[in-house]
Amino acid sequence: MHGNVATIEDIVLDLKPEPFDLYCREQLEDSDAEDETAVTQPDKQAFKVLSQCGGVCCKTVRLCVYSTHTGIRVLQELLHQDALQIVCPTCASRL
């Protein structure tokens, strides 16, 4: 810069594209193997199920299950359709 104030002519930009390697050296596992394990071993988790006793008392019955999301949906459908009823220990002893 020559003088007290910078002018456009005084500013020199040296912008040259700098090439760099876009390829990653990381090794990826075969994605087909991951897909097969996901299908054969679905993730299970714990669920708390609250339902009314299917016996005489109609008390609230709490059930803890370890299931997949698909399995818990099937259980939910069975309970809603009255195809399956959970019975409390007191009513179960009367059966």
UniProtKB/Swiss-Prot annotation:
Highly phosphorylated. Disulfide bonds: none annotated. Its main location: host cell. InterPro entries: Papilloma_E7. Residues 1-41 are annotated as: E7 terminal domain. A motif (LXCXE motif) lies at residues 22-26. It is found in: Host cytoplasm; Host nucleus. One of its GO terms (molecular function) is protein domain specific binding. GO terms for cellular component: host cell cytoplasm; host cell nucleus. A motif (Nuclear export signal) lies at residues 72-80. Keywords: Activator, DNA-binding, Early protein, G1/S host cell cycle checkpoint dysregulation by virus, Host cytoplasm, Host nucleus, Host-virus interaction, Inhibition of host innate immune response by virus, Inhibition of host interferon signaling pathway by virus, Interferon antiviral system evasion, Metal-binding, Modulation of host cell cycle by virus, Oncogene, Transcription, Transcription regulation, Viral immunoevasion, Zinc, Zinc-finger. A zinc finger (unnamed) spans 53-91. GO terms for biological process: DNA-templated transcription; symbiont-mediated perturbation of host cell cycle G1/S transition checkpoint; symbiont-mediated suppression of host innate immune response; symbiont-mediated suppression of host type I interferon-mediated signaling pathway. Belongs to the papillomaviridae E7 protein family. Plays a role in viral genome replication by driving entry of quiescent cells into the cell cycle. Stimulation of progression from G1 to S phase allows the virus to efficiently use the cellular DNA replicating machinery to achieve viral genome replication. E7 protein has both transforming and trans-activating activities. Induces the disassembly of the E2F1 transcription factor from RB1, with subsequent transcriptional activation of E2F1-regulated S-phase genes. Interferes with host histone deacetylation mediated by HDAC1 and HDAC2, leading to transcription activation. The E7 terminal domain is an intrinsically disordered domain, whose flexibility and conformational transitions confer target adaptability to the oncoprotein. It allows adaptation to a variety of protein targets and exposes the PEST degradation sequence that regulates its turnover in the cell. Homodimer. Homooligomer. Interacts with host RB1; this interaction induces dissociation of RB1-E2F1 complex thereby disrupting RB1 activity. Interacts with host EP300; this interaction represses EP300 transcriptional activity. Interacts with protein E2; this interaction inhibits E7 oncogenic activity. Interacts with host TMEM173/STING; this interaction impairs the ability of TMEM173/STING to sense cytosolic DNA and promote the production of type I interferon (IFN-alpha and IFN-beta). This is Protein E7.
